[in-house]
């Protein structure tokens, strides 16, 4: 079983005291203010063999997301919708405690949060992925790989997922007497996305709340709360992690900070996506 850095007590007490003493002055180890996000870069179409892909670098955290489309049957309870399947892998090269093998509970949790944010926001219109109602639909496989764990991997996974979906090509479907097939030589458009979604994480360290915690900050945090937003700032996902607790006042303050951060991050994401 792999364990995430936030579960490892790897920061000496002296270093924690040093980090918190900087918080008292309103700054962090890397020079950021408590409410600042790390530098973000997004490279679209990074994996050429995928139908869509994006490489996201958030500080030292690096995540690659790729998509593949295939014709499939709809689920029985959603005959008029396409399918979305999200997988996240914490690669062993990303951090020293990550182990090879099937996804562990940390990877599964990340996949569920990303999936829930995309579904509950209706960012991806699954009804437009229907080829033949009740018979055939597009299944979107969204695979997310954490390549370098430098903290706050959830926000990076959401960014990479959304960017990869926006980058995804949809190919022509051809009807035959014996069924249907995909013509990979003819692109007919992109996935039917309504708008982007972002996730903003805020960590509680001692009495301080910090946006986009890095690896050291996650290692000493008491708890973390993550909010997912649509462009109209509707909350479409909330996830709390860490062993410590957060008061209602902490949560309210964290949400206010996350909301204002989401406005800026959504604008930056839109510029990268050209929308």
UniProtKB/Swiss-Prot annotation:
Q: Cellular component GO terms, alphabetically? A: cytoplasmic exosome (RNase complex)
Q: Name one Pfam family in it.
A: RNase_PH
Which molecular function term from Gene Ontology is one that the record holds?
mRNA 3'-UTR AU-rich region binding
Which residues span the membrane? none
- Write out the entry's keywords from A to Z: Cytoplasm, Exosome
Q: Which domain of life is it from?
A: Archaea
User: Which NCBIfam families would you find in this protein's record?
Assistant: PRK04282.1-1
Protein family according to the UniProt entry? Belongs to the RNase PH family. Rrp42 subfamily.
Q: What is this protein called?
A: Exosome complex component Rrp42
Species per Swiss-Prot/TrEMBL record:
Saccharolobus solfataricus (strain ATCC 35092 / DSM 1617 / JCM 11322 / P2) (Sulfolobus solfataricus)
């Amino acid at each position: 079983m792999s364990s995430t850095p936030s579960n490892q007590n790897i920061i000496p007490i002296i270093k924690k005291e040093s980090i918190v003493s900087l918080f008292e002055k309103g700054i962090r180890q890397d020079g950021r203010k408590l409410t600042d996000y790390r530098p973000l870069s997004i490279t679209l179409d990074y994996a050429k063999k995928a139908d869509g892909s994006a490489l996201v670098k958030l500080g030292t955290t690096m995540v690659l997301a790729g998509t593949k489309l295939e014709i499939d049957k709809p689920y029985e309870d959603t005959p008029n919708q396409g399918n979305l399947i999200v997988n996240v892998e914490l690669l062993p090269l990303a951090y020293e405690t990550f182990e090879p093998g099937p996804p562990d509970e940390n990877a599964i949790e990340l996949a569920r949060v990303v999936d829930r944010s995309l579904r509950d926001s209706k960012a991806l219109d699954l009804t437009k992925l229907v080829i033949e109602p009740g018979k055939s639909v597009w299944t979107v496989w969204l695979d997310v790989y954490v390549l370098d764990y430098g903290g706050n991997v959830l926000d990076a996974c959401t960014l990479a997922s959304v960017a990869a979906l926006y980058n995804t090509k949809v190919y022509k479907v051809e009807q035959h007497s014996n069924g249907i097939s995909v013509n990979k030589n003819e692109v007919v458009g992109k996935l039917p996305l309504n708008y982007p979604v972002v996730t903003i994480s805020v960590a509680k360290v001692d009495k301080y709340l910090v946006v986009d915690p890095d690896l050291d900050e996650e290692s000493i945090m008491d708890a973390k709360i993550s909010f997912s937003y649509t462009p109209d700032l509707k909350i479409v996902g909330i996830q709390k992690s860490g062993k410590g607790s957060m008061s209602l006042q902490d949560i309210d303050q964290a949400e206010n900070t996350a909301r204002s951060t989401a406005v800026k991050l959504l604008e930056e994401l839109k510029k990268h996506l050209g929308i």
